[in-house]
Amino acid sequence: RGLGDVYKRQEHPEAEMWFGTHSGDPALLATDNDRTLRDVVAADPTHELGSATAHTFADNLPFLLKLLAAEEPLSLQAHPSLAQAQEGYARENAQGVPLDAPDRNYHDPNHKPELIVGLTRFHALAGFREPQRTLELFDALNVPQLQPYVEMLRAEPDATGIRAVMTTLITLTADQLRECITATQEAAQRLVAANGEWVDESVTFLGLVSEYGNDAGALCALLLNRITLEPGEAIFMKSGMLHAYLHGVGVEIMANSDNVLRGGLTSKHIDVPELMHVVQFDALLDPIAPAENVVLSSHGIVPA
């Protein structure tokens, strides 16, 4: 209810509030709720955007700002590069897939790099953990059902190994998933009780299973950095970076796109082959950008 609390609208939970011109949900003008920011920009893009921006971005506002409030974990997802988005958008248009179809992947021809800044403490999964550290986590869990996949990563402790393990985990059969997740639950509970190094990762895994059941995304989450942003800290999600927001309120700036490829932890459309096509499997070693000291001025929030 984070956004409802901020804007005093608490009739129902609100996960996102968009400020932009994207056709999926253009912002309404405070002075005229029948007119959108998209309408204003379209009427005179050179005046509203400036000639250089209007020329470079085909008369479109190039970014989308969101307030995001995650009470429960959001989907495991990644976003395409510009070339991938353009190709995917053209392909689905040629196939006659309606823009509002629930199984459509590409709603526009734009990429979607994004940066999120925590307004509260903000928990997320972001990018692949360094493979050696992931091996240490799996060794601590010591789940026999996962050992074949652990050995795959041990044999190739790099992006190739991460790709192989994730490809295997995300395509397990329902019976295999149930067996692996049940065994990993028991191991994670043991690590939580021991209150050792991998408590946060174990608690997160258990929470995902509680929320989504035998979902492959819960196992894939064990490959990712589990991070916590303090207020003012940020993380940049480049194209192809696998991530999932877990809990907290943040402000997010991104390219003007709504292209999302999902791989789990959701009831929405999942397209595993397309997700694996766009995901980058290199480890993310230093994900968090520290907060800068800021002060309030007549121009808003500026560096101190």
Question: Where are the language model's segments positioned?
Answer:
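Short, structured patches in soluble enzyme cores that scaffold and shape functional sites
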Residues: 78-80, 111-121, 130, 142, ...
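Short, small-residue-biased leader/transition segments that mark boundaries at the very start
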Residues: 2-7
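Conserved AWS/pre-SET-to-SET junction and N-terminal core of the SET lysine methyltransferase domain
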Residues: 203-231
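C-terminal, non-catalytic macromolecule-binding modules
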Residues: 249-300
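Conserved metal-binding segment of the jelly-roll/cupin
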Residues: 76-77, 228-247
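N-terminal functional module of multi-domain proteins
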Residues: 14-15, 20-106, 110-114
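A short glycine-rich, His/Asp/Glu-containing loop-to-beta-strand
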Residues: 10-22, 62-67, 289-304
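Long, charge-rich alpha-helical interaction segments
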Residues: 135-211
